[in-house]
Amino acid sequence: MSATTAEFFRATHEEWGVEFDFNHGLASIDGKDGRVVGVTTDDGRTLPADVVVYGIGVIPNTEIAEAAGLAVSNGIEVDERLVTSDPDISAVGDVVSFPCAQLGGAMTRLESVQNASDQARAVAARLTGDGGDYRTLPWFWSDQGHLKLQIAGVAHGYDHTVELPAEAGQKTVLCIKDGVLVAVETVNGPADHMIARRLLAERPELSPEEAAAEDFDFRAWADSRVAVGAR
């Protein structure tokens, strides 16, 4: 996610009464009579709490792969066909580090339902004789209150963002890297999201200046690129 969209959600949650405390961890979870009553931070503060929610799963579980002698680096390494260093073993999902076509083949690990499901389909197709390289465009979503965040593409390494004019309650952010549109982030904007999913696999060229121009029409521009790609 771009800093532009992340800042929007941070500010929105703060408007809803959420308080963020970044760059600190927990030293302990404090309890009394079998119930949590607070937490102590690693800088010595005590915060009252009725409920503590763990966020887990960020570190890939590669123990079985390592025991099997498979290559591991930020996940189980696979090639374009999702085959591990052992040609008889394939791997898919959040635990896999794969060459992402949208990032020029850079080894990438994605944590999303779409990626895990589509990788599984790709392996199944290959095993039944009807599959090639995994090149599916990544996309993501998150429902937060009345806001639906949808992301098409991968914004890793973007160098410019352009926020398009939008109706109240909506947002569309274009993420550009080296003059190529690499991701589109929308809030309550399903039409722009679906357009982006059709478009981004072609890695369309788009300069920040063109995207920021007052007369830039994203949907018309996207339609012209899709039409060219279909020829």
Predicted segments, located by residue:
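Mid-to-C-terminal Rossmann-like scaffold of FAD/NAD(P)H-dependent oxidoreductases
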Residues: 95-194
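A general beta-strand register signal
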Residues: 21, 40-41, 143, 176
